[in-house]
A protein has these predicted regions:
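Short amphipathic alpha-helix with an adjacent loop that forms part of the alpha/beta core around
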Residues: 35, 85-87
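Non-catalytic, surface beta->alpha helical segment in thiol-disulfide oxidoreductase systems
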Residues: 97-132
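Thiol-based oxidoreductase modules, predominantly thioredoxin-like and allied folds used
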Residues: 47, 69-83
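Structural micro-motif
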Residues: 87-96
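N-terminal leader/targeting and pre-domain segments
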Residues: 1-42, 125-132
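Short alpha-helical
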Residues: 53, 79-82, 111
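Structural signal for short hydrophobic segments within the conserved structured cores
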Residues: 25, 73, 104-106
Length: 132
């Protein structure tokens, strides 16, 4: 079976499939609570912004890392002020862990597979809380 060709950012033909190893979702003020409560497994919730260089790096790198998660949930901090306030986001990118609709807090770590997986394991050993 032949895969369809696509183009890269310079419009050159490419048959490379996205390197993402996890499901990715975009969440908003309007649907984040409902969707996070309904999702089973581990979700890494990441607040980003268009003008943030570290956020662009996170968007590029995180989908391809071998992380112990089921999905990445992206939230644009500039467009979703209600979530930014409720999650008390003060820096970007900001990472949080949700498992089976329960909140396990923030992650403060480097954006590498080893560091993130260690921080995820530590976070998931905390007592779960309700979503903010």
């Amino acid at each position: 079976m032949k895969r369809p060709m696509s183009t890269d950012s310079l419009c050159r033909p490419s048959d490379i499939v996205s390197p993402s190893i996890v499901v990715e979702s975009e969440l908003t003020d309007f649907d984040a609570d409902q969707r996070l409560l309904a999702m089973s497994g581990v979700s890494l919730v990441i607040f980003t912004s268009v003008g943030c260089a570290s956020c662009r790096y996170a968007r590029q790198v995180l989908p391809g890392l071998p992380l112990a998660i089921d999905r990445l949930c992206w939230i644009d901090a500039g467009d979703n002020g209600g979530l930014v306030e409720r999650y008390q986001v003060f820096h970007l990118p900001a990472l949080f862990v949700v498992r089976d609709g329960e909140f396990f807090g923030a992650l403060h770590t480097r954006l590498t597979a080893d560091a993130l997986n260690a921080a995820l394991a530590q976070a998931l050993n905390r007592t779960a809380e309700e979503l903010p």
